[in-house]
């Protein structure tokens, strides 16, 4: 049995002792030692944990610097007012008829260079009506498309019916047996 057990080769072994608990009789397993070591590290780093955001993994702790999280929050807060300014330029929001707005440089400056929103994205006045008319034309086209599809598959269906009649002497359209090679018996369910 000794040939199947692999002995670990440890060059510099460091023993871990838990000073908070009195030594127990018997022996400690590796899992218990690792658990105690993790608790000890957690207690020793508790003062650091308050100042940083961190993610505790099994083998290590990932520390997120507060500087990065604060800058992301500030960027989001800066984007919210600029998006609101672009949304207020929407002519559909007003109760009057839709009319095209003149180019406004303050809107582009407020949206920023990275998040630049074109005037056509902020202006839905003329495009909204075009989309509705396109939708109506698509509905009328779908009826003609259905008839084209039926015409396309009609010849294939007729060919399949002829093949079935020749092979099995049964008309699947009218559900009637035909005289020929097979004798059909009606079964009552």
Curated annotation (Swiss-Prot):
Report keywords, A-Z: Cell cycle, Nucleus, Protein kinase inhibitor
For whether the record's keyword set contains Nuclease, the answer is: no
Give compartment(s).
Nucleus, Nucleoplasm
One Pfam family for this entry, by name? Answer: CDI
Task: Please give the biological process terms from Gene Ontology that the record holds.
Answer: negative regulation of cyclin-dependent protein serine/threonine kinase activity; positive regulation of DNA endoreduplication
For this protein, what is any one GO molecular function term?
chromatin DNA binding
Tissues where this protein is expressed: Expressed in flowers and at lower levels in roots and leaves.
Q: Record's GO cellular component, any one?
A: nucleoplasm
| Segments of this protein annotated with the region Disordered | 73-107
Broad class of where this protein is predominantly found? nucleus
Feature: compositional bias, Polar residues: 73-93
Instruction: Output the InterPro entries linked to this UniProt entry.
Output: CDI_dom, CDI_dom_sf, KRP
Quaternary structure annotation from Swiss-Prot or TrEMBL: Interacts with CYCD4-1. Does not interact with CDKA-1.
- What task does this protein carry out? Inhibits CYCD2-1/CDKA-1 complex kinase activity without interaction with the complex.
Indicate the family of this protein: Belongs to the CDI family. ICK/KRP subfamily.
Mind telling me what this protein is named? Cyclin-dependent kinase inhibitor 5
Q: What is the native source organism of this protein?
A: Arabidopsis thaliana
């Amino acid at each position: 049995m000794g040939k199947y057990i692999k002995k670990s080769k440890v060059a510099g072994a460091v023993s871990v002792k838990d000073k908070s608990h009195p030594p127990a009789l018997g022996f400690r397993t590796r899992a218990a030692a690792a658990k105690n070591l993790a608790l000890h590290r957690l207690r020793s780093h508790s003062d650091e944990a308050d100042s940083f955001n961190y993610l505790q993994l099994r083998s290590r702790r990932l520390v997120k610097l507060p500087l990065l999280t604060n800058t992301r929050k500030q960027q989001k807060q800066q984007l919210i007012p600029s998006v609101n300014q672009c949304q207020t330029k929407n002519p559909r929001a007003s109760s009057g008829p839709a009319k095209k707005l003149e180019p406004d440089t303050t809107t582009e400056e407020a949206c920023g260079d990275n998040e630049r929103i074109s005037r056509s994205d902020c202006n839905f006045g003329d495009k909204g009506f075009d989309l509705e008319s396109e939708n109506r034309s698509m509905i009328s086209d779908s009826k003609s498309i259905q008839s084209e599809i039926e015409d396309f598959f009609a010849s294939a269906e007729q060919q399949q019916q002829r093949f079935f009649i020749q092979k099995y002497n049964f008309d699947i359209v009218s559900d009637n047996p035909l005289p020929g090679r097979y004798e059909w018996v009606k079964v009552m369910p």
